[in-house]
Amino acid sequence: MNTPPGVAAAPARVLIVDDERHNRQLLEVMLEPDGYVLLTATSGEEALEIVAQQLPDLILLYIMMPGMDGYQVAARLKGDLATRHIPVLMLTSLDDRNSKVHGLRAGAEAFLTKPLNRAELCARVKQLLREVA
């Protein structure tokens, strides 16, 4: 995301990963006004395919998904030299310490719990993108 002086920065690519369409749509509505290029995946497996093809700048990753859950996806991403630099923001309705610790150990940089607040979500997204810029 480093941009030479005088060159307009390309919008950040944000991958939203959730098996529930309503959650993906809600995140799209919250993030669209900030001009991000939004990618979506409906499963952990699909997320890994998209990451391999499009290398997003940030991943918003729900924990509770059938098949490969968010913890497993984060661990795979952070275990790969090609993707370990991509920040992962885990989104969950689980607000207990063990879930957060498990996510951080899997490699997530941050957590947000439902119900999501647009201002907090957008601030966290901008913060994580700044940290990797």
Locations of the language-model features?
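C-terminal output helix
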Residues: 116-125
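Receiver (REC) domain active-site loop signature in two-component systems and cognate sites
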Residues: 65
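Active-site beta3 strand of CheY-like receiver
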Residues: 54-60
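Short hydrophobic/Thr-rich beta-strand motif most characteristic of the beta2 strand and flanking loop
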Residues: 35-42, 50
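Charged docking surfaces used in two-component/phosphorelay signaling
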Residues: 25-33
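Active-site residues of response regulator receiver
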Residues: 18, 62, 92
